[in-house]
A protein has these predicted regions:
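Structural and coupling elements of P-loop NTPases
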Residues: 1-662
């Protein structure tokens, strides 16, 4: 593929709820643009974007994929993302380098949770937004209901560009509101036949066209005057207004069609090529501190942002990047601004699914891949200019689902750490550790499906078989009341002996660990032995009296004791403190603690009762309910015990204190 100038490059991120049809839309776009010679189908496991074995097996996207195509002289880098929240990390990576977001909506299901989270993400990333209402080959699809829901949820900036012609339950064609024509699409090629609008659809066409032009007029004062004066707004003025309105977020166009039959995809491609922004439209990029970095597409300084890493068992580490400044060329040597180390790029590729095509150069705003950058990870900046530049990193979600892992194959236990280390470079949302308490290997991910996929990748790529077992809960112990105690250590075996005597008061503490105080009078215990007493209590707290779990939240006061001029020493008072601990804690009403999480669930008003019921069934305790920023929604805050932190997808956890076990 030739090198494209910055002005002729569009980076479009496909977002939306799981199973809305993002990958099918990407396949239709690729096929119509002749980037592929067949229309891939998810049901047949032959799509360009879902090529991973697990994606084929599960019939859903797991990994984000880039798939470039050329349409009317414009290079469009289609970034296909997973729709399920377990794989949110990949979505965030693509959103970081996209210049616009296209949110795909199921024409039957309408606005779903994933639709709202996609919109919120695009807004947060300052991405221009469009909607594509999909699946109008299904008789149960309801365009007007879904469109009204989009306007209700996301505001009056949402405006129609196409609407379907519906005769009974059947879609007979589509109305282009800009050119005021009707289209009949060919499901074999994606081509369309342009016709005059049938008389029975004229009324609704005029109604929705007026809605479109009202949105267009609001982007410019001169157009507003023409609109209210009843003057015609030309097509050229409309296209420019849509372009500017999309960039500024004043217009959120809505397209419709059926991806698997390629209905509406050509008109979508036309709009992307004509009206979607190029990389330089925003003039600057953010650095890691939130400051603006000017974009210079033609300068001598080349800088790249590595947004994604893939651990390939054959190619090695694959680093996907966006050219943020200048032009990147093969065999360039750039500096990693995080490490200060030089990286030689070697060969540069553009990637379409699993296929790679070598290129010599890529212009500012384009997306490519380079292999075997050993010291580079996702969110790194590479440059031949100012080594202090650090582009704003991808903000990955916090993962909360933890499971123990065991090796299933002979010799696999020794290879688990190395295999997971490679996947950690690829997936920044997972973590791996060995528990100091249980000695259990623990893998943490966004959700159960996420962990299952990690296990499958270990097997498929590195031949490592693992199984999951429940995490051994890290219980703690504490006390609930005050108790007096005494400990005396005395040992005499000829020569110097050992003697230490302490009187202690134990009570519930306000801090997680030990709060140690002393109220010794008259020198009953010399001050130089106070640290030994404290150390003895701290060591004793490593093992509780109920089940041997560590003690937390303990206040210990040294109130008195006695000593011997010759036989007393630090070890004697340390051992005396341990004896006092063993004497006093059983009398202080000890209790077992289990971990809890504090969470907040944002949900529509209609579901708040169900959520509270589910929380109660899982031994949760509701802390309060408050209005959400979005109308018609509430925020339920609660604490949940142990594994109940996996209550719902989309739950956000904030703290992890401890609560008495039931």
């Amino acid at each position: 593929m030739e090198m494209f100038e910055t002005k002729n490059i569009r980076n479009v991120c496909l977002l939306g709820h799981g199973d809305a049809g993002k990958t099918s839309l990407a396949e239709a776009m690729l096929y119509i643009a002749k980037a592929t010679d067949r229309l891939g189908k998810i049901s047949e496991g032959n799509t360009v974007c879902d090529y991973d074995a697990e994606e084929v097996k599960r019939s859903c996207s797991i990994n984000a994929t880039v798939a470039p195509l050329v349409w009317e002289g414009i290079k469009i880098n289609v970034l296909d993302t997973p729709g399920y929240p377990d794989f949110e990390g990949d979505v965030l990576e693509c959103a970081r380098v996209a210049d616009a977001a296209l949110i795909v909506v199921d024409g039957k299901a309408g606005v779903e949770v994933g639709t709202e989270t996609s919109f919120d993400l695009a807004k947060k990333m300052l991405l221009p937004i469009s909607f594509f209402i999909n699946r109008f080959d299904d008789p149960e699809a309801r365009f007007y209901k879904v469109f009204d829901s989009l306007r209700e949820h996301f505001g009056v900036a949402v405006c129609p560009v196409q609407i379907p012609m519906i005769d009974g339950d059947k879609v007979t064609g589509f109305l282009d509101l800009l050119d005021f024509e009707s289209y009949i699409f060919d499901s074999a090629t994606g081509d369309y036949l342009s016709l005059e609008i049938p008389e029975q659809f004229m009324s609704i066409a005029e109604e929705y066209r007026n809605m479109l032009f009202e949105s267009i007029a609001q982007t410019d004062d001169a157009l507003m005057e023409k609109f209210f004066a009843g003057e015609e707004i030309t097509r050229e003025e409309s296209v420019e207004a849509i372009h500017n309105g999309i960039i500024r977020g004043e217009i959120i166009p809505v397209f419709c069609g059926a991806a698997t039959k390629m209905w509406g995809v050509k008109t979508l491609l036309d709009t992307i090529a004509d009206s979607y922004p190029r990389h330089t439209a925003k003039k600057t990029e953010l650095d890691a501190l939130g400051e603006d970095i000017p974009i210079d597409k033609e300068g001598d300084v080349c800088s790249l942002f590595v947004y994604k890493t893939v651990a390939d068992p054959f190619v090695g580490k694959m680093s996907f990047f966006k050219v943020m400044n200048g032009t990147v060329k093969r065999d360039m040597t750039l500096t990693n601004t995080r490490t200060g180390l030089s990286e030689r790029l070697g060969r540069i590729y553009i990637v379409r699914g699993k296929k790679q095509e070598e290129v010599d150069t890529l212009a500012c705003g384009d997306i490519g891949m380079v292999a075997k950058l050993n010291d580079t990870i996702s969110s790194d900046t590479l440059t031949n200019g100012n080594a202090d530049i650090h582009y704003y990193p991808v903000e990955y979600p916090k993962a909360y689902t933890t499971k123990g892992i065991v090796a299933l194959g002979k010799g696999d236990e020794d290879k688990i750490s190395s295999g997971i280390a490679k996947l950690l470079e690829e997936d920044r949302t997972i973590s791996f550790r060995v528990s100091k308490e249980s000695k259990q290997m623990l893998l943490t991910g966004v959700g159960d499906t996420h962990l299952d996929v990690i296990a499958a990748k270990l097997k498929n790529r590195f031949g490592i078989s693992i199984g999951f077992v429940p995490e051994k809960l890290a219980y703690r112990e504490t006390i609930r009341k005050r108790a007096e105690a005494e400990g005396k250590h005395k040992k005499q075996s000829g020569g110097s002996g050992q003697y230490g005597h302490v009187k202690m008061t134990f009570a519930p503490g306000e801090e997680d660990g030990l709060t140690f105080t002393e109220t010794v009078f008259g020198g009953e215990v010399p001050k130089n032995f106070f640290p030994a007493v404290q150390k003895g209590i701290e060591e004793a707290m490593q093992q509780g009296v109920l089940a041997g779990y560590p003690m937390v939240g303990l206040a210990a006061n040294l109130s008195g004791g006695s000593y011997h001029d010759v036989d007393s020493n630090e070890i004697s008072f340390k051992l005396a403190a341990i004896l006092a601990y063993k004497d006093g804690i059983p009398k202080a009403s000890p209790v077992l603690l289990e971990p809890i999480g504090t969470l907040a669930v944002t949900a529509p008003d209609a579901y708040v009762g169900d959520i509270m019921g589910d929380l109660n069934r899982r031994r949760g305790r509701v802390l309060g309910i408050s209005p959400a920023p979005k109308a018609g929604s509430q925020i339920v805050e609660a604490v949940v015990m142990g594994v109940a932190v996996q209550l719902l997808s989309g739950v956000r956890l904030f703290v992890t204190p401890w609560i008495a076990a039931h």
